[in-house]
Amino acid sequence: MSSGQSFSRSLLKLPLSVMVKGTTIPSNPIDDLNIDLTKPIVYALPFRSNVDLLTLQKQAMSLGLPDPLSPLEINGKTLNRFVFIASRPTVMGNDNDIPTDSVSLFTELLELHKLDSELDVQMIPATVLWGRKPGKEESHRPYLQPMNGPQKAKAVMAAGRDCLVRFSPVVSLRYMADSHGTDSAIAHKLARVARIHFSRQKLAASGPNLPQRQVLFARLLKSPAIEQAIEDEAKSKDISIEKARKEAHDIMDEIAADFSYGLVKNGDRILSWLWTKLYQGLHINNASTVRRLAQDGHEIVYVPCHRSHMDYLLLSYVLYHEGMVPPHIAAGINLNFFPAGPIFRRGGAFFIRRSFKGNKLYSTIFREYLAELFAKGYSVEYFSEGGRSRTGRLLQAKTGMLAMTIQAMLRGLNRPVTLVPVYIGYEHVMEVGTYAKELRGKRKEKENAGLVLRTLRKLRNFGLGYVNFGEPIQLNQYLNEHAPEWTKDIDSMGGSKPQWMNPVVNELANKMMTHINDAAAANALTLCATALLASRQRALSRDSLINQIECYLKLLKNNPYSSTSTIPTESAEELVDHAISLDKFVIETDSMGDIISLDRSQSILMTYYRNNIIHLFALPSLIAQMIIRQRNLTVEKIQENVAQIYPFLKKELFLSYQEEDLNDLVVKTLNEFAEQKMICLDGNKLEINQSNNQPLVLLGRTITETLQRYSIAMNLLVAYPELGKSDLEQKSQDIAQRLGRLHGINAPEFFDKGVFTAMFNTLKQQEYLDSDGNCDKKKTQKFAKLLFTLLYPEVKLTIEESIHQLQA
């Protein structure tokens, strides 16, 4: 290092320490990027810059990484630990050539690998981004630009508190040397590849250049599809082309986002304060997978579950803090009220009407706008359920936006399109009380400013929030597998709907929802709610509750539901203490200790949180209930019974297990029960351990309400095999409501007609009903008999009496 460089860096350190507050992506690069600290490390930066180097130094050392300014010793040679891929421009001109000293360092490092077969230098590309404002569409400048001295000083002053230091996956120089050789040409190639990589990093962090809104409208109005729709509108309404075009412009103005980086940047500060006030922390998982997709140039479509209006803000906030661009979000037109509407719009929301069936002009404009977002490379987010879940369960997907996504691909997109399922979980959903009222028949209140103000008054500590990114679904690959000749239907005009579209979209929607549930996050409140609701009086002693949570944790840890689901790291006792601190339970103390219970209103609210994770326990709960209710069971009999019931659970709860894996899963679950000493397993036979049967009983009760619903429908079919779809759904709902009143079942979804509708579809798929709705009575009787064996006698009696009264 020259003395001049050393002096200038020492001068810069003090002002930079005051003016720069960097954020690192990822926050824990050593673990997230699998950096091996026992191997030599070299940092690669895009441009020669002492400011960037010193900023990197501060962040690297705070993370436990080597100091970029410390010398690198390899086999007796002392080398720089950093390399610049391009020179720094000056006010007199720009020199983008790769610096000679950088090429020399690359060449020397590659040569050292040639001489030492054990050597493996890790190169870590690192980008220092000063602000993340996207460019303007009319600009032809590159995404990542070098800055001269005055420009860099201005950037530090303007964006020093918004500085992002982004570490990329390690590049093994051992691999480069072995695969490509060690001469200077390879060193040049390595530098060129790094330059492309840095440009992609900037694009992933800032997003594509933004158009002016009116320029976008003008471009859309010239699209052949919209021009044709305007002509058709003019003819059908007998109005002038100018008036129809004005209508089209008004629709665009209603729909289109007006993204503002300034609002996002300032909004981030407000949201950081808000999350700190509301939540004790946010847990984010698997974000690195999404970052890789963004950096590799994928068109990303986020498809989160929808629990709360908070979802809009939370996911954008998390993505921004994970170094990615907040997406353009499809929001219901009901949210376009003052002042929320304009704020959401400038934060990236575009608004969609609840229904636009029969409105060709609107549907064409919306489809063209969505295709434009995809074509320009903006990430998009839409809620696949169509609205917020009032029960806490994942709803059946609305497929309209998914179909339009595939239609956009049929326009000839030149980038891969990938769905990213997102599970969002909370320990408190602020609308949950409203949901319970709506499910009891109260009319939904229209969103307005007054509602927002009333909600803000309720803000308090809501515990923890969770954002888990699920396994991505690459649509190009999916279409190649399920519609191999889909590329033949590519049409630049758009709007085509090939015959394969509907079945493929329906299958894709089910896969998407399954991947969302796969990424579920169990937490203190959902686990405690599950346990308390399984007890007969909605009450457990503190010790029993801790014991039950311990049972759940072992099940989830030893037999993980999926690779993307998460479980708490705290002990059962710590989780119970945390759940109690959320002030949702009744705590009473007697001479033997604390009793934790739910009153009636709390029981209804707690079903929401239980339903968030009920799918995680569906199979273990079903097996437990069989063991509790059926005697002299063998492993084979359990496997047979599970195979009969599982298709209904799979459809209703979006379970990911494949039918061919069920037998192995049953064995693994039984082994875990035995390990927890809930049962004694002797080869093919098993029996309950009576000295430790409470965890098994509580586990089994979690699924009983679902089995009761199935039993109602199946026994109705046995009694009335000629029942049609609507009659079966209505009578099932009537009996479920009666059962709920007589047996204190508070779960709102217990008599939800939509759940019976989903079951009716499964009855057809499993051939209990043929295509004309005729019942296979023998098969239905067998299933109804099995379900009855899993119910408690008093519930079974109520179902029999209710069906008998209908017959009378």
Curated annotation (Swiss-Prot):
Pathway: Phospholipid metabolism; CDP-diacylglycerol biosynthesis; CDP-diacylglycerol from sn-glycerol 3-phosphate: step 1/3. A motif (HXXXXD motif) lies at residues 306-311. GO terms for cellular component: plasma membrane. Disulfide bonds: none annotated. Its EC number is 2.3.1.15. It is found in: Cell inner membrane. It is a peripheral membrane protein. Its main location: membrane. Keywords: Acyltransferase, Cell inner membrane, Cell membrane, Lipid biosynthesis, Lipid metabolism, Membrane, Phospholipid biosynthesis, Phospholipid metabolism, Transferase. GO terms for biological process: CDP-diacylglycerol biosynthetic process; fatty acid metabolic process. Pfam families: Acyltransferase (PF01553), GPAT_C (PF19277). It catalyses: sn-glycerol 3-phosphate + an acyl-CoA = a 1-acyl-sn-glycero-3-phosphate + CoA. Belongs to the GPAT/DAPAT family. The HXXXXD motif is essential for acyltransferase activity and may constitute the binding site for the phosphate moiety of the glycerol-3-phosphate. This is Glycerol-3-phosphate acyltransferase. The gene is plsB.
